[in-house]
Amino acid sequence: MTNSKFNIFINKKTISINDRAFNYGDGLFETILVKNNKIIYLKEHVRRLHKGCDIIRINKPTLSLIKKNAEIAIGNRKNCILKIILSRGSCDFGYQYPKDLIPNLYFIRTSISSDKGNMTERVDVAYANYKPLGNNNLSKIKHLNRLDQCLIANELQNIKNGYNDLVITQNKNIIETLSSNLFFAREIKKQYFFDTPLISDFGIKGVMREKIIQSLRKKGYKVNIKNIEVSDVKKYASCFKVNSVKGIIFIDRIGKNKFSKPEILYNILKSFIY
């Protein structure tokens, strides 16, 4: 389906060999939870997509266009995951492209996986050996160049001792896990304080991360966005990872550092625990 500004593909199983997303990773994506037939945080995901469009200079699809086609892709599926991929378009091979190239906009519905953590399941996390290089121009947005994450996923697949995830570090600072942002919590005089790693020249500023920061601050909790070194982890009592598909997952251990899962944290954050 084509309108004047975008080629639109809904639940398409194939892609053109000339699509620049396939050839060069020239595009953006968002992965969104659909719960009880509601698209969760659609406006926030589109806002980040638009920011990415500004950075890599692709035309912005409007919120109304995305919402309309997202609902078609979801159909009558009550709970699922919606992936939106925005490619610069299809053209002959070569880095340069025609100025009038029409972007390709894909809407893909997939099933929700069952590997969700909760308060009772054990989640052990190790540190990734792979150290990504920074790119301040492309960090924070969901661009299609995911080779760093693929290499870290390969490392996780081959690691022993039953680890569930890997923490990515850069210059001794903790950034995030393979596909989630991190929060650390300290209890001082029965009051909780929260820290989350600064996202600078690597990593994603997640939609769920921002929602949790806003929620905690609205409830009166102090949340610091700061550099957290590996050596700082032992200072914290609790830790959890977050993303927009799985919500909050509490972590039992990172490396040798063990964490607790107090009931009060569950009560504070329960609206984000899926």
Question: For the regions a protein language model found, what residue spans apply to each?
Answer:
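Phosphate/pyrophosphate-binding loops at sites that engage ATP/ADP/AMP, CoA/4′-phosphopantetheine
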Residues: A73-K78
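Helix-start/capping segments and mature chain N-termini
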Residues: M1-S64, K68-E71, S87, D92, ...
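ATP-grasp fold ATP-binding core
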Residues: I81-L86
